[in-house]
């Protein structure tokens, strides 16, 4: 009978510790790109919806990740990541 291999990798950090570190990193990045009152309202909404629970922590992590991804993708002025307008050819030809 087959058995799953034993875990031979390095021990993982606890999920809660990882989640709090990830949330802290996302918050630090978010305050560089979004207005603080807006982020405060987002945090208040999450707290009102989920209370002080791990589900709330997971929700705000997910929302901040999405917001930052979209922000960078649309062309954050602080980042090299983003959609750059295509340059038009000088001879008038245009590829579609």
From Swiss-Prot:
Subcellular location: Virion; Host nucleus; Host extracellular space
Phosphoserine modification, residue list: 79, 96
Keyword Ion transport appears in the UniProt entry: yes
PTMs per UniProt: Phosphorylated on several residues by host. These phosphorylations regulate VPR activity for the nuclear import of the HIV-1 pre-integration complex.
A GO CC term attached to the entry: host cell
Region (Homooligomerization): 1-42
InterPro entries xref list: RetroV_VpR/X
Superkingdom of source: Viruses
Disulfide linkage: none
Predominant cellular place of this UniProt entry's protein: virion
Keywords from the named record: Activator, AIDS, Apoptosis, Cell cycle, Host G2/M cell cycle arrest by virus, Host nucleus, Host-virus interaction, Ion channel, Ion transport, Modulation of host cell cycle by virus, Phosphoprotein, Transcription, Transcription regulation, Transport, Viral penetration into host nucleus, Virion, Virus entry into host cell
Alphabetical GO biological process terms: DNA-templated transcription; monoatomic ion transmembrane transport; protein homooligomerization; regulation of DNA-templated transcription; symbiont entry into host cell; symbiont-mediated activation of host apoptosis; symbiont-mediated arrest of host cell cycle during G2/M transition; viral penetration into host nucleus
Note: HIV-1 lineages are divided in three main groups, M (for Major), O (for Outlier), and N (for New, or Non-M, Non-O). The vast majority of strains found worldwide belong to the group M. Group O seems to be endemic to and largely confined to Cameroon and neighboring countries in West Central Africa, where these viruses represent a small minority of HIV-1 strains. The group N is represented by a limited number of isolates from Cameroonian persons. The group M is further subdivided in 9 clades or subtypes (A to D, F to H, J and K).
Family membership noted in the UniProt record: Belongs to the HIV-1 VPR protein family.
Function: During virus replication, may deplete host UNG protein, and incude G2-M cell cycle arrest. Acts by targeting specific host proteins for degradation by the 26S proteasome, through association with the cellular CUL4A-DDB1 E3 ligase complex by direct interaction with host VPRPB/DCAF-1. Cell cycle arrest reportedly occurs within hours of infection and is not blocked by antiviral agents, suggesting that it is initiated by the VPR carried into the virion. Additionally, VPR induces apoptosis in a cell cycle dependent manner suggesting that these two effects are mechanistically linked.
Subunit structure comment from the entry: Homooligomer, may form homodimer. Interacts with p6-gag region of the Pr55 Gag precursor protein through a (Leu-X-X)4 motif near the C-terminus of the P6gag protein. Interacts with host UNG. May interact with host RAD23A/HHR23A. Interacts with host VPRBP/DCAF1, leading to hijack the CUL4A-RBX1-DDB1-DCAF1/VPRBP complex, mediating ubiquitination of host proteins such as TERT and ZGPAT and arrest of the cell cycle in G2 phase.
Designated name of the protein: Protein Vpr
Source organism of the structure: Simian immunodeficiency virus (isolate CPZ GAB1)
């Amino acid at each position: 009978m087959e058995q799953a291999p034993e875990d031979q990798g390095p021990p993982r950090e606890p999920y809660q510790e990882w989640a709090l570190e990830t949330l802290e990193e996302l918050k630090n990045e978010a305050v560089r790109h979004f207005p603080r009152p807006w982020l405060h309202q987002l945090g208040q909404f999450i707290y009102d919806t989920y209370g002080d629970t791990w589900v709330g922590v997971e929700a705000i992590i997910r929302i901040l990740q999405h917001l930052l991804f979209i922000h960078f993708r649309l062309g954050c002025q602080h980042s090299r990541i983003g959609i750059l307008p295509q340059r038009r050819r000088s001879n008038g030809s245009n590829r579609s």
